[in-house]
Amino acid sequence: MTSSADLTNLKELLSLYKSLKFSDSAAIEKYNSLVEWGTSTYWKIGVQKVANVETSISDYYDEVKNKPFNIDPGYYIFLPVYFGSVFIYSKGKNMVELGSGNSFQIPDDMRSACNKVLDSDNGIDFLRFVLLNNRWIMEDAISKYQSPVNIFKLASEYGLNIPKYLEIEIEEDTLFDDELYSIIERSFDDKFPKISISYIKLGELRRQVVDFFKFSFMYIESIKVDRIGDNIFIPSVITKSGKKILVKDVDHLIRSKVREHTFVKVKKKNTFSILYDYDGNGTETRGEVIKRIIDTIGRDYYVNGKYFSKVGSAGLKQLTNKLDINECATVDELVDEINKSGTVKRKIKNQSAFDLSRECLGYPEADFITLVNNMRFKIENCKVVNFNIENTNCLNNPSIETIYGNFNQFVSIFNIVTDVKKRLFE
């Protein structure tokens, strides 16, 4: 019988397989180790180890330089490497997250702009983007035929955010040390946090990456959220001294197994610290970490993609959309609106609050029932006032994990439907 750990490994193997063409060397190494594990465990798994990948970003980036070195004379383009989730937009014309292989929906105008850039030069292998705080910025553009600067200028004309860059001539052998690093970094005066610098010598394709940093451990006082958009909140890790440690998104928080009142490993830069992107210490399963973090953030929030959103009035909006009626600001308005339509009123009467709330959020029925069967609820006056997951193993299923992360929203809608039913039919 397949164990939950095996299922997790197989899920990761499948995800890496789908994204091989966009993988870096670390992801390829991880993929090959999982293929080796899968072959020894199950004999035949339908995929093979790879030595070379048609489009691996490692073909374009040398190993990171983290100690001072001499840089040769020549003309150079220096680019910032931003903190955030890295995505690749290629000739497949979809935005794919580097490493996970997950496709990501982007606005139509952004997709159109990316396609125009790709169509302008058949030598472009891919465009590299970073997503942070729900904002996109193009970080690099890989072309066999032209400088990324030319592509940046075109991308800007099409409305895409482009990076600051620096074009300079170095006339003699120069020591690239902390001082030079800081001078170049300060020239990139945009608001995006920068974790390293890449540079290209004129006439060469491969990027060199420079990252001077120090590892440190910091004590975590609290985990909170910061508003970054219309009902969009990013996790915020606060140290004992009140400083913020930068976090990419909810999944970054989960992978690192951050816990209040413990120490975490960080990469210290000149002006900020970054939560070190590694599978954190400890024996907690991913499901256990998800439960703990959601409990820490509180019942007022739910996981919404890479970020958190506040339950608030979001449930009312989704319910009115599902019922195809006018938007309502309060339950009183909702009851009045339902009373205007006999069809909607009959639907409310004949369908259980449980099923209507599930359908409203589009949860797959089988996965939803599996999750609910692993939970315990506290009910008062027919409303859910508290819930607790008793067995987190079911969260190994990514669909069930998504539903659980969103469950505070389900409870909000369920309680609204229960209230509406009482007012209409009792």
UniProtKB/Swiss-Prot annotation:
It comes from Vaccinia virus (strain Western Reserve). Plays an essential role in viral DNA replication by acting as the polymerase processivity factor together with protein OPG116. Serves as a bridge which links the DNA polymerase OPG071 and the uracil DNA glycosylase. The keyword rRNA-binding does not apply. GO terms for biological process: DNA replication. Belongs to the orthopoxvirus OPG148 family. Keywords: DNA replication, Phosphoprotein. The gene is OPG148. The keyword Ribosomal protein does not apply. Pfam families: Chordopox_A20R. This is DNA polymerase processivity factor component OPG148. Interacts with the DNA polymerase catalytic subunit OPG071. Interacts with UDG/OPG116. Component of the uracil-DNA glycosylase(UDG)-OPG148-polymerase complex; OPG148 and UDG form a heterodimeric processivity factor that associates with OPG071 to form the processive polymerase holoenzyme. Interacts with OPG117.
